[in-house]
Amino acid sequence: MSDKIRTLQGRVTSNKMDKSITVAIERQVKHPLYGKYIKRTTKIHAHDETNQCNEGDVVTISQCRPLSKTKSWALVEVVTKA
């Protein structure tokens, strides 16, 4: 196991929860038969201690210990405001 902490960058899609945000991580995958690159989205729940994020913000999140059943990521910084 590596010592490097895993970080991802994505767009905030929901901030309706208290101290939590939903971040959409977009990646491109090559289609196995046709070879065209397709956009795939993964939604991740992250911890936002100060409730500073709004919908549309681009944020950096990092992996942490499990904080709830679905939350094991924490907000590192807001890259750009919406």
From Swiss-Prot:
UniProt xrefs under PANTHER family: 40S RIBOSOMAL PROTEIN S11 FAMILY MEMBER, SMALL RIBOSOMAL SUBUNIT PROTEIN US17M
Gene name for this UniProt entry: rpsQ
GO CC annotations on file: cytosolic small ribosomal subunit
Ranges in a coiled coil: none
HAMAP family listed in its UniProt record: Ribosomal_uS17_B
Family annotation (NCBIfam families): PRK05610.1 (NF004123), uS17_bact (TIGR03635)
A Pfam family it matches: Ribosomal_S17
Protein name as it appears in the record: Small ribosomal subunit protein uS17
Keyword entries, A-Z: Ribonucleoprotein, Ribosomal protein, RNA-binding, rRNA-binding
Subunit structure: Part of the 30S ribosomal subunit.
Function comment: One of the primary rRNA binding proteins, it binds specifically to the 5'-end of 16S ribosomal RNA.
Keyword Transmembrane helix: no
GO molecular function: rRNA binding; structural constituent of ribosome
Record-annotated disulphide pairs: none
Family affiliation: Belongs to the universal ribosomal protein uS17 family.
Lineage: Bacteria, Pseudomonadati, Pseudomonadota, Gammaproteobacteria, Alteromonadales
GO biological process, one term: translation
